[in-house]
Amino acid sequence: MTPTLYYCYDAYCGWCYGFSPVIRRVFKEYRDRLAFEVLSGGMILPEKPQPIGVVAPYIQKAYKTVEGHTGIKFGKDWLWHIFNPEESDWYPSSEKPAIALCVFKEYHPELAIPFAADVQYALHEEGRDLTDDEAYRHLLEKYGIADKEFYEKLHSPVYKAKAYEEFALVKQLGITGFPTLLLQVSESRAYLLSRGYTDYETLRSALERALEAAGQEAS
């Protein structure tokens, strides 16, 4: 089988946003050797919608740590909601971006990595509300997906069920933090490549070691 790299992430995860240039580069350089799959982790799934103000005080400090470690910069439109939570109408939930990813994979499963990164950019740089259908419209044009069909599927219980299946799978795998990368090399063998933010060179070394070990086991 072709080794498959599983990228477990959440659209609202700031560390995943910081990691997005790394995973984009891995995808670009290894897409001819590996299959890639993105799984949404369901990081924010409140029983009742909670305003951004619940987490804003924590994020006001934490985003600087992410910037310092990763070199990523958060956009002013996103930061406005973080520093003006009492004026924001945001109620974050991981559900809709996860459903959107499941719908997208019906069209372009091989491009799930760049799409996931684009969704994170839409939130953390452009300040788009991922619980709003309109947050995805510009990406439909980019990837050549018909609006009407996409939005019908976005509100279909079938794709909602697919998203929750991903949440359950991530939990079943014992993954509690994001980003996490796994490399599956056979039906019974997988390697944990990284847990949390990892720079490109460190990740590349771990990936090459895993591929080498898998090759030795197969021979």
Model-predicted segments: where are they?
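C-terminal cap of thioredoxin/glutaredoxin-like
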Residues: Y7-C8, Y12, F19-K28, D118-S219
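Structural alpha/beta surface segment adjacent to cysteine/selenocysteine redox centers
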Residues: S20-L123
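Extreme N-terminal starter segment of soluble prokaryotic enzymes
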Residues: M1-Y6
